[in-house]
Structures are given as C-alpha cells and as structure tokens.
Amino acid sequence: MKDISVKALAKINLGLDVVRKREDGYHEVRMVMQTIHLFDRLEISKNTSGEITMETNLSFLPTNENNLVYKAAKLLQDEFAIKDGVHVWLHKYIPVAAGMAGGSTDAAAVLYGMNQIFDLGLTREELMERGVKIGADVPYCIMRGTALAEGIGEKLSKLPPMVKCPVLIAKPQISVSTKFVYENLKLGSDMVHPDIDRLVADIREKDLYKIAADMGNVLETVTIPAYPVIADIKDHMMEHGAVNAMM
C-alpha cells in the first residue's frame, strides 16, 4: 500500500469535571467524551525521500515539527526505522482552538494510516500507547465513540454508544488558551461540579433528556466571565430549542 485516506473525527465533551490539582501541577479530570461526524481528512502517502512533509488548506497552520501530525509521523518513523518518507495532505474542517481535539485526532489518523501503509501490525491498544506520547487526547481519538476519561485524560473506559441526536456547533471568533483556563480555575468548596457518574448512568439508559440535564463543564466558571459571548451563544441555542448547550 502506497497511500491511504483517513477520516479524523472531532470530539465533544458531554461532561467535564476537574477533581483536583495534583502535586506535579497537572489537573485530575473526569470527563465524558463523544466523537461526532465532523472530521478532517488526511491523505497519507509514502515516498523515497526519507523526509516527513505536509501541506494543508489552512495557511496559518504549521507544517513542521510544531504540528502533531508531524510528531506522530516522526514517532513511528524513528521507532520502526522507516527509511521511506511520508507526505500528509491535511484537509482541515474541524475548527481550530475549539476544544474539539482537532490536532489530536489528526495525529491519531497519522498513526492509524502509517500503521496500514507500512504494515506495522500494531493493535489499537498499541497505537493508543504510542498516542499518549504525543498528547493526552490522542489515545481517545484512536479509540473513538463514547468514553469516560480520568486521570489527566489518559485513563479511558469505553461506554455504550451515545443515543443518536443532532448536534449544533458554534465557534465564536475567540481563542481560549488551555493554560489560561486551568491557571484561573478556582477549585473551592462552593464550586458546583457536574455529576459525571449520573451522566454515565444516563448514557447507559440511552435517555437523551436526562443526558442533556446532567451535562456540564466546570471550566465554564473561567471562560464565561472572561468571554461573555459563550453565555450569549448558549442562551441563543436554548431559546431556539436546544435540549442543552455547553462549552
């Protein structure tokens, strides 16, 4: 096989809670994640150049080692002493800096695609083990579907498929830094946390309205005061028939 076309699915959070800040500075989370049918497409091909190259339809995206696509290709090229070069054409449709794992899912697609092209024989679990070296969300983007993530996001438990429903996504013209959000998160006794266990139970029951009622993202306590447009969008969605709206 010389080339392959791979879909890289976006993800949304149905629930996100931060349990505590660990001594190493990382935050321990519990979140329920779901892949959706919005995706980037990656055309991956091998050549004799020995180099990793990429191009994309978005001029502002890096196409060097600063892109997770490049890092994923480099990881497998180095580990398996692959002499051939790899070229990736990234057709980017997932909004950038939207919390939808756009970079991570592209990296996951490269791991999957190179595994096929070079006949590496890696299982999904083995791909996930390599994915975590690139980013905490990459293993989930390989797993896909509905899942509970714990730890710093790397401990994954598969959940029953989410009940099918339409999803509307709005991306305002803002870019929220993950570092900014976590640095300004105040984990106090007065904070209202989403009930992740109840949300998981709702998913098992396949009750859309219970799921909607129990959705929540504790990071909104930081983002909404800083970017009121998020609240405006949520209100607009609720006024026009959404069963719930969440960042």
What residue ranges belong to the model's regions?
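Generic non-transmembrane alpha-helical segments
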Residues: 72-79, 126, 130-133, 214, ...
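Conserved, helical-rich catalytic subdomain that frames metal- and/or nucleotide-binding sites
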Residues: 143, 148-244
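Glycine/serine-rich anion-binding loops at beta->alpha junctions
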Residues: 89-118, 136, 243-247
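Contiguous, small/hydrophobic- and glycine-enriched helical/loop subdomains that border
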Residues: 85, 107, 111-148
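ATP-binding N-lobe of GHMP and related small-molecule kinases
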Residues: 1-98, 116, 120-128, 152, ...
